[in-house]
A protein has these predicted regions:
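Conserved AMP-binding A3 loop
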Residues: 25-27, 148-175
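Conserved AMP-binding/adenylation subdomain of ANL enzymes
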Residues: 171-188, 196-236, 250
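Conserved AMP-binding/adenylate-forming core of the ANL superfamily
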Residues: 13-44, 52-59, 66-68, 85-87, ...
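Conserved ATP/PPi-binding loop(s) of AMP-dependent carboxylate-activating enzymes
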Residues: 315-319, 330-362, 398-400
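AMP-binding/adenylate-forming catalytic core of the ANL superfamily
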Residues: 344, 350, 374-457, 469
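Conserved pre-ATP/AMP-binding loop-to-beta segment of ANL
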Residues: 8, 12-13, 131-152, 159, ...
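Gly/Ser/Thr-rich phosphate-binding loop
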Residues: 235-238, 248-308, 321
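Conserved beta-loop-beta connector loops within the AMP-binding
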Residues: 309, 323-343, 379-380, 439-443, ...
Length: 496
């Protein structure tokens, strides 16, 4: 059975997609996918071709039609949101992508080798009519096995990298997500995370393979755009901690259907206060997952495990092997903190060439993937992540865990979002606390509360902002933010 075979075998009258008041049946979804498949075929895009996909604005349904059509015709495809993501997707030689399918405003300064293809779907009308193609079923099912996905890492270092998911790797990643579709065709999935992320890509396909409905969640990738009604319709939410916090803080009441709803939270640490708030207002079950674009899911479990350790992410899953090692690669005893390394049955072997081989060789080594995390593996197999190597910083000779500070900041009343950043100032390294809050950031009580969170005699500065920028996976791009903060601090010093 192919990846898309179960989708096309579903009851044509069953609901596949819900966007506001619009209901799209499986019959319509499949017709739209085939219409775009033929439209691309007629323009020379097929098995082995490379296709970048970017749809701006409230076009979540059509984004999915485009991705499914790319798989249908056997194309190698990538989800594009900027030139920053386009460059690694094209590869060092620029030969990974041949065409760029977009709706809305196109990216500027496209490489000459990339052929732009534009469609402008309006509303939810049948795509065959909108494209002016004859409605007909795709008659080349054998092409699908050539499909591949160019998956981009989250870019938490400020520099995204690309991996090639073969057809088999795609199938494995989607099967992992499928194990969470426990209600089968009765599931109503609301994926509150961007399509360009690993989870945002695989969960909807897994839901459709099970005959379930996918709920459109917003006009962008900002959790604040999610309607109360959309969440209430859902039985399964896939969400980042940042978006979860935003939704909870913006809602004045609990969500109906609470007892039949499960939340899967991934991408970062889940503070116990956030977990408890989610259990009170959103769902009866909160699960945490740990994994990466490079390896797929590595571990998972009930968020209650965070009572044992704030960074608990569950137990190994899907044939994953997890080790905690020292700097020389020697395995450490259970319960001892060290460097996390991972091996999974369908992990990628390397990034697509991008001229940064040193980074690649340090992350993929001797059949292991080193995600850059520090963690503990307990005797019973529980994995706890203490933070990324880059998130444990040295300020004034004292090592400080930024995630630990952030978790404690979010426990303070009136703090909607927060992050801690090390800024390399010309005089000395600085610990900068960035807050989204209605509080006066110069208030003495706030300074005293934060002072108790950091090591004694560690100086810090507080910067207040309207929002903390995060990527599609809900992660803060620390290097980018640190540079912006440095510029701000230097300007303040210059201005006096």
């Amino acid at each position: 059975m192919t990846l898309l075979g179960p989708i096309f075998g579903n009851d044509p009258a069953a609901v596949a997609f819900v966007g506001g008041k619009e209901r799209i049946s499986y019959g319509r979804l499949c017709e739209d996918v085939d219409a775009l498949a033929w439209w691309l075929h007629d323009r020379g895009i097929g098995a082995g071709s490379g296709l970048g996909i970017q749809f701006k604005g409230g076009l979540s349904y059509w984004v999915w039609v485009a991705h499914l059509a790319a798989i249908r015709i056997g194309a190698r495809h990538a989800t594009i949101d900027s030139l920053k993501s386009l460059r690694p997707a094209m590869g060092a030689d620029g030969n990974q992508l041949d065409a760029y399918l977009f709706a809305g405003a196109a990216l500027r300064n496209l490489p000459p080798s990339l052929r732009p293809l534009s469609i402008e779907p309006r509303g939810f009308g049948p795509l065959a009519e909108q494209l002016g193609v004859k409605p007909r079923a795709w008659t080349k099912p054998e092409t699908e096995c050539h499909a591949a996905r160019i998956a981009l890492t989250s870019g938490t270092t400020g520099r995204p990298h690309a991996l090639l998911w073969t057809y088999d790797i795609m199938a494995d990643r989607i099967a992992q997500a499928g194990s969470d579709i426990v209600n089968g065709a009765q599931e109503r999935l609301c994926p509150l995370i961007g399509t360009g992320t690993t989870a945002g890509f695989r969960y909807p396909i897994a839901a459709w393979r099970a005959g379930a409905a996918v709920l459109s969640w917003s006009n962008g990738n900002d959790g604040r755009a999610v309607s109360h009604a959309t969440v209430q319709r859902s039985t399964l939410l896939v969400i980042s901690p940042a978006n979860l916090r935003t939704i909870i803080s913006s809602s004045k009441s609990s969500y109906q259907g609470h007892g039949g709803r499960t939340l899967i939270v991934l991408g970062a640490r889940v503070p116990t206060s956030l977990r408890d708030a989610a259990l009170r207002t959103m769902g009866a079950r909160v699960n945490v997952h740990y994994g990466s674009t490079e390896t797929g899911r590595v571990a998972g479990g009930d968020a209650a495990l965070t009572d044992r350790h704030p960074g608990a992410v569950g137990f190994a899953s899907g044939g994953a092997t997890i080790e905690i090692v020292d700097a020389d690669g020697v395995a450490l005893p259970a319960g001892e903190a060290g460097i996390v390394r991972i091996r999974t049955p369908s992990m990628c072997g390397d990034y697509l060439p991008d001229g940064n081989s040193d980074r690649q060789s340090s992350i993929f080594k001797d059949g292991w993937f080193y995600p850059g995390d520090h963690g503990i593996l307990f005797e019973d197999g529980l994995l706890a992540i203490e933070g990324r190597a880059t998130e444990t910083v040295n300020i004034g000779g004292i090592k400080i865990s930024l995630p630990d500070i952030e978790s404690r900041l979010l426990e303070l009343p009136g703090i909607a979002d927060a992050c801690a950043i090390r800024v390399a100032h010309r005089k000395d390294d600085l610990l900068v606390i960035v807050l989204v809050s209605a509080q006066d950031h110069e208030s003495k009580p706030l300074h005293e509360a934060i002072g108790k969170m950091v090591p004694k005699n560690t100086p810090f500065r507080i910067v207040k902002t309207r929002a903390i920028a995060r990527n599609a996976a809900g992660k803060v791009q620390r290097d980018v933010l640190a540079q912006k903060l440095l510029t701000l601090i230097e300007k303040r010093e210059t201005d006096g």
